Each structure stands twice: as C-alpha cells, then as structure tokens.
C-alpha cells in the first residue's frame, strides 16, 4: 500500500512511539487522526505538527481506548472528518502490574476492539476498500518477563490475536492485512514507570533486574519503530508478520512456519 493520500488512525499518538508513527505517516503524505486520552499532550502534539504539516492533515481526538463507546465514537469522527479509513495503528499501551485489569483492558482488549472497529470500515465485506492494521506488541510478547507478568501476557495476546486474525483475512476476503511490531526497550515514558510502585506493585523490588536488561538489550529511538511501521504498511506481501526491532539486529522478523496452507497467499 502506498501511504501517500491515505487516512490513518493512531492510538496513543500524543507522545512516544505513537507520535513518531504520526510523524512518519505524515512525512509519507498520509492524513492522521491523533487519538490519545491525554488532552494536554494531544493538543500540544497537534499544534507542533501543524507547524510542519498542513493543519487539515491531522485531527486530534481525546479518547480513553478502554471505553468501548468512546472508541466507537472516535472511529465515527475520523471517518466523518476524513471521509475514509485506510490504516489503523493500535499503539496505546501502559505498564501497570498493580492495576493489572487496566493493563489488560488497554493493552489487549482495546487492540481487539479497535481491530474489529477498523474492519467495520475497511473490510471489503462491509463495503470498504481494504487496508492495513498494525498492532503494537513487544519483545515481551515473545518471551517470559518475570518482573512484568501481566504486561507480558497482554503482549503475548496481541501476537496470538494478530496472527490468527491475519490468517482469517484470506478466508473472509476482507482485503485488510494485519501485522504486529515487537520492539525491545524504547525511549518512552513506559521506561520511567518501572521505578514507580503504583505501576510495578510487588515487582518494584526487581527494578534493578529490568535496568540490567536495558543495559544488555540497549534502548531504541521511537523513530526506528516508525521506520518499521512504514515497512509493514507498504509491503503488500506482509500479512500476519511479527516484526522484531532490536539495537543489535535492527528490523527483522520472527520466523514462524505454523500457518496452514489455506491461510497462505
């Protein structure tokens, strides 16, 4: 898919990886709906982008993605404003082992809800023109993380859901590709949360172990994750792909050979 002229919806877009995604898409010529619960950060993000891009190229919508009604209204507003939806990036995420229900609701349930809402607008079965859905996972979705079991579970769930939903694409003829991104540690506010008891709960005493892992794996810039996003969108052969991004190996893919023949293009 060529990004130029397309309409994208990015959750968690006001800062960090989400903002890098928005900037990357805008540089490629897309129009972007900036969706975030943080009103102040969202307004500042929109204002900053307006200085570099035409103001009509972006739309900020405050939304708690864990609220199904708000999320549904957000999709409606985006399509009403831009007239279409071609790209969905389910990026919003948190790290909270203490309030683990919140972590699952935002990291996993909202991704599933967002995907189905996106399909309502993009699927050829529903009169859409097809599109691409990218879900944000993590290397924690590919391996156990003793200090963050719930965060880890949510990211594993994203991979299982994305691969399965992508497999169903050919069976359902939706015309919508789905892929996931699994970066290592990224320089965002989530890294700061590992030092807060209100986020880590009983695992706060293991913060030193996580910091040791950071030293081992290194820390990525959000812009590198945005480069991976563009690759997943533009390569029409990628469906059900799980992209890994690390400081040591850059952008590469998890190797799977488990898809039945009927699901392969």
Curated annotation (Swiss-Prot):
<feature type="binding site">
    <location>
        <position position="148"/>
    </location>
    <ligand>
        <name>substrate</name>
    </ligand>
</feature>
<dbReference type="GO" id="GO:0006693">
    <property type="term" value="P:prostaglandin metabolic process"/>
</dbReference>
<dbReference type="GO" id="GO:0097070">
    <property type="term" value="P:ductus arteriosus closure"/>
</dbReference>
<keyword id="KW-0644">Prostaglandin metabolism</keyword>
<dbReference type="GO" id="GO:0045786">
    <property type="term" value="P:negative regulation of cell cycle"/>
</dbReference>
<keyword id="KW-0520">NAD</keyword>
<dbReference type="GO" id="GO:0070403">
    <property type="term" value="F:NAD+ binding"/>
</dbReference>
<comment type="similarity">
    <text>Belongs to the short-chain dehydrogenases/reductases (SDR) family.</text>
</comment>
<feature type="binding site">
    <location>
        <position position="138"/>
    </location>
    <ligand>
        <name>substrate</name>
    </ligand>
</feature>
<feature type="binding site">
    <location>
        <begin position="151"/>
        <end position="155"/>
    </location>
    <ligand>
        <name>NAD(+)</name>
    </ligand>
</feature>
<dbReference type="GO" id="GO:0016616">
    <property type="term" value="F:oxidoreductase activity, acting on the CH-OH group of donors, NAD or NADP as acceptor"/>
</dbReference>
<feature type="binding site">
    <location>
        <position position="91"/>
    </location>
    <ligand>
        <name>NAD(+)</name>
    </ligand>
</feature>
<comment type="subunit">
    <text>Homodimer.</text>
</comment>
<keyword id="KW-0560">Oxidoreductase</keyword>
<dbReference type="InterPro" id="IPR002347">
    <property type="entry name" value="SDR_fam"/>
</dbReference>
<feature type="binding site">
    <location>
        <begin position="12"/>
        <end position="20"/>
    </location>
    <ligand>
        <name>NAD(+)</name>
    </ligand>
</feature>
<feature type="binding site">
    <location>
        <begin position="63"/>
        <end position="65"/>
    </location>
    <ligand>
        <name>NAD(+)</name>
    </ligand>
</feature>
<dbReference type="Pfam" id="PF00106">
    <property type="entry name" value="adh_short"/>
</dbReference>
<dbReference type="GO" id="GO:0007567">
    <property type="term" value="P:parturition"/>
</dbReference>
<dbReference type="GO" id="GO:0030728">
    <property type="term" value="P:ovulation"/>
</dbReference>
<comment type="function">
    <text>Catalyzes the NAD-dependent dehydrogenation (oxidation) of a broad array of hydroxylated polyunsaturated fatty acids (mainly eicosanoids and docosanoids, including prostaglandins, lipoxins and resolvins), yielding their corresponding keto (oxo) metabolites. Decreases the levels of the pro-proliferative prostaglandins such as prostaglandin E2 (whose activity is increased in cancer because of an increase in the expression of cyclooxygenase 2) and generates oxo-fatty acid products that can profoundly influence cell function by abrogating pro-inflammatory cytokine expression.</text>
</comment>
<feature type="active site" description="Proton acceptor">
    <location>
        <position position="151"/>
    </location>
</feature>
<dbReference type="GO" id="GO:0007565">
    <property type="term" value="P:female pregnancy"/>
</dbReference>
<dbReference type="GO" id="GO:0005737">
    <property type="term" value="C:cytoplasm"/>
</dbReference>
<protein>
    <recommendedName>
        <fullName>15-hydroxyprostaglandin dehydrogenase [NAD(+)]</fullName>
        <ecNumber>1.1.1.141</ecNumber>
        <ecNumber>1.1.1.-</ecNumber>
        <ecNumber>1.1.1.232</ecNumber>
    </recommendedName>
</protein>
<dbReference type="InterPro" id="IPR036291">
    <property type="entry name" value="NAD(P)-bd_dom_sf"/>
</dbReference>
<dbReference type="GO" id="GO:0016404">
    <property type="term" value="F:15-hydroxyprostaglandin dehydrogenase (NAD+) activity"/>
</dbReference>
<dbReference type="GO" id="GO:1905828">
    <property type="term" value="P:regulation of prostaglandin catabolic process"/>
</dbReference>
<dbReference type="InterPro" id="IPR020904">
    <property type="entry name" value="Sc_DH/Rdtase_CS"/>
</dbReference>
<keyword id="KW-0043">Tumor suppressor</keyword>
<feature type="binding site">
    <location>
        <begin position="186"/>
        <end position="188"/>
    </location>
    <ligand>
        <name>NAD(+)</name>
    </ligand>
</feature>
<dbReference type="GO" id="GO:0004957">
    <property type="term" value="F:prostaglandin E receptor activity"/>
</dbReference>
<dbReference type="GO" id="GO:0051287">
    <property type="term" value="F:NAD binding"/>
</dbReference>
<dbReference type="GO" id="GO:0007179">
    <property type="term" value="P:transforming growth factor beta receptor signaling pathway"/>
</dbReference>
<dbReference type="GO" id="GO:0070493">
    <property type="term" value="P:thrombin-activated receptor signaling pathway"/>
</dbReference>
<feature type="binding site">
    <location>
        <begin position="36"/>
        <end position="37"/>
    </location>
    <ligand>
        <name>NAD(+)</name>
    </ligand>
</feature>
<keyword id="KW-0963">Cytoplasm</keyword>
<keyword id="KW-0276">Fatty acid metabolism</keyword>
<keyword id="KW-0443">Lipid metabolism</keyword>
């Amino acid at each position: 898919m060529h990004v130029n002229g397309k309409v994208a919806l990015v959750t968690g877009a006001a800062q960090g990886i989400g903002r890098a995604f928005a900037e990357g898409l805008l540089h490629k010529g897309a129009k972007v709906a900036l969706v975030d619960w943080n009103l102040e950060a969202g307004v500042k993000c929109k204002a900053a982008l307006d200085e570099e891009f035409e103001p009509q190229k972006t739309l900020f919508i405050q939304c708690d993605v864990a609220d199904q009604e708000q999320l549904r209204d957000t999709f409606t507003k985006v399509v009403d404003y831009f007239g279409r939806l071609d790209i969905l990036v389910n990026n919003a995420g948190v790290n909270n082992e203490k309030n683990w229900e919140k972590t699952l609701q935002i990291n996993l349930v909202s991704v599933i809800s967002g995907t189905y809402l996106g399909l309502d607008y993009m699927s050829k079965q529903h009169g859409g023109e097809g599109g691409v859905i990218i879900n944000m996972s993590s290397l924690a979705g590919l391996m156990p993380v003793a200090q963050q079991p719930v965060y880890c579970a949510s990211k594993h769930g994203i991979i299982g859901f994305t691969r399965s939903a992508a497999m169903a694409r050919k069976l359902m003829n939706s015309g919508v590709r789905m892929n996931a991104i699994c970066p290592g540690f990224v320089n965002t506010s989530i890294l700061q949360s590992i030092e807060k008891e209100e986020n880590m709960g009983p695992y706060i005493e293991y913060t030193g172990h996580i910091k040791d892992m950071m030293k081992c794996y290194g820390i990525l810039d959000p812009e590198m994750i945005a480069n991976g996003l563009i690759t997943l969108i533009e390569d029409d052969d990628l469906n059900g792909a799980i992209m890994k991004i690390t400081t040591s190996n850059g952008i590469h893919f998890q190797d799977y050979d488990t898809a039945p023949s009927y699901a392969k293009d």
